[in-house]
């Protein structure tokens, strides 16, 4: 009695701050796949490009596993933006001091599924 969880794609170790990518993900959550892709293409943020690549992969996985599906039948069921490791870099400051600059990474997981009404 396991419930089908949809078709998943994950992209890991992307150099983008999770706090900057999450607002982009919240815009397209629970939207039909074609509408979500159209929204992401018109957004100026770097996170929109990263999410759209992962979403294309999830849709491709869905179409490969279920030949009867069409892209118009899919919707974005779930998007998770998780925090990854941080790259530590040195930022030289005045008077011989240095600060640590953290380059944050994120993991993007997109789950698409077939709409229940069809």
UniProtKB/Swiss-Prot annotation:
Pfam families: Ribosomal_L22. It comes from the Bacteria. Keywords: Ribonucleoprotein, Ribosomal protein, RNA-binding, rRNA-binding. One of its GO terms (molecular function) is rRNA binding. Gene3D superfamilies: Ribosomal protein L22/L17 (3.90.470.10). GO terms for biological process: translation. Signal peptide: none annotated. GO terms for cellular component: cytosolic large ribosomal subunit. The keyword Ribosomal protein applies. Belongs to the universal ribosomal protein uL22 family. This protein binds specifically to 23S rRNA; its binding is stimulated by other ribosomal proteins, e.g. L4, L17, and L20. It is important during the early stages of 50S assembly. It makes multiple contacts with different domains of the 23S rRNA in the assembled 50S subunit and ribosome. The globular domain of the protein is located near the polypeptide exit tunnel on the outside of the subunit, while an extended beta-hairpin is found that lines the wall of the exit tunnel in the center of the 70S ribosome. NCBIfam families: rplV_bact. Part of the 50S ribosomal subunit. This is Large ribosomal subunit protein uL22. It comes from Treponema denticola (strain ATCC 35405 / DSM 14222 / CIP 103919 / JCM 8153 / KCTC 15104).
């Amino acid at each position: 009695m396991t419930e089908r969880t949809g078709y998943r794609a994950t992209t890991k170790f992307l150099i983008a701050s999770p706090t900057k990518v999450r607002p982009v993900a919240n815009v397209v959550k629970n939207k039909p796949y074609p509408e979500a892709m159209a929204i992401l293409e018109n957004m100026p943020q770097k996170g929109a490009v990263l999410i759209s690549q992962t979403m294309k992969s999830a849709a491709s996985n869905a179409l490969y596993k279920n030949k009867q599906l069409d892209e118009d039948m899919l919707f974005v069921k779930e998007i998770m933006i998780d925090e990854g490791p941080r790259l530590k870099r040195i930022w030289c400051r005045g008077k011989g001091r240095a600060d640590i600059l953290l380059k944050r990474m994120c993991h993007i997981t997109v789950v698409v599924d077939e709409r229940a009404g069809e």
